[in-house]
Amino acid sequence: SFDMWERRKSPYDYARYFAEWHERDLTDEILRDRNHASVFMWSIGNEVLEQWSHADATELDLQAANLILNAGHAIDPALLKDTTLSRQSLITRHLAAIVKRLDTSRVVTAGCNEVNPANHLFRSDALDVLGFNSHERYFEPFLRNFPGKKLIVSESTSALMTRGYYEMPSDHIYIRPESWDKPFEAPEHVCSSYDNCHVPWGSTHEKTWHLVKTLPHVSGLFVWTGFDYLGEPTPYWWPSRSSFFGIVDLAGFPKDVYYMYKSEWTDEPVLHIFPHWNWKEGEPVDIWAYYNNADEVEL
């Protein structure tokens, strides 16, 4: 899918070529992959700036634009009164039509971090399934805001973890950074693996997965992210070089929450007890035996 359409996120991105190449590139992608059994829907965009109904978001650099888009805002009913289609909505229809012309067996979606019904992509009525990037608090009222629509969580969670590091009490939720435009400062540059630390626009793995399991209109989710990755260091900036989002770290070792998903997504027996046992005498320790698929667990 496209990471940008006509509106650029950085000076030398695909927006320079969108007008000339979008139809050829989208066509080539679909013809290449439409016979793959793993393809169950097509996305025509990820956090494209055309979604946004506020012009300020289109004037920012890449990092600032993504962060401010993720911050979200309250739904403005006044924006819904205008029923005319914008250029952005027409582009959405155009791209969806290309997909449908080449593959009628799959649905079309787009990953959006603008969850307002005034979102130009949503207003096009060309998306079979609406994709939300984070914004878990809008999952429950989804059907009130989008009657008759379907939802997939195209990016979820954005929880922060460092394998082997634990911050207690484990039931306290740490929001880091407090503001999208300022890094969190701590000398260790680590994040708790109790699933109790996440960014302001995200949520914990447990809370997000509970919503997906219990809300019938939510079809599923993609976890942001499967692996830590170089770039977008969050919540710390330099000298951190990588994200802390993954359920697997850069060395390929699973973090604790990996076993929550394994207990939910596989039929294998799972019992994962943590944290580690390398503590000094007298230190309080919160022990979790929560990641399992047993009827009960006895320590």
Task: Outline where the language-model segments fall.
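Extended substrate-binding grooves/exosites of carbohydrate-active enzymes
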Residues: 1-299
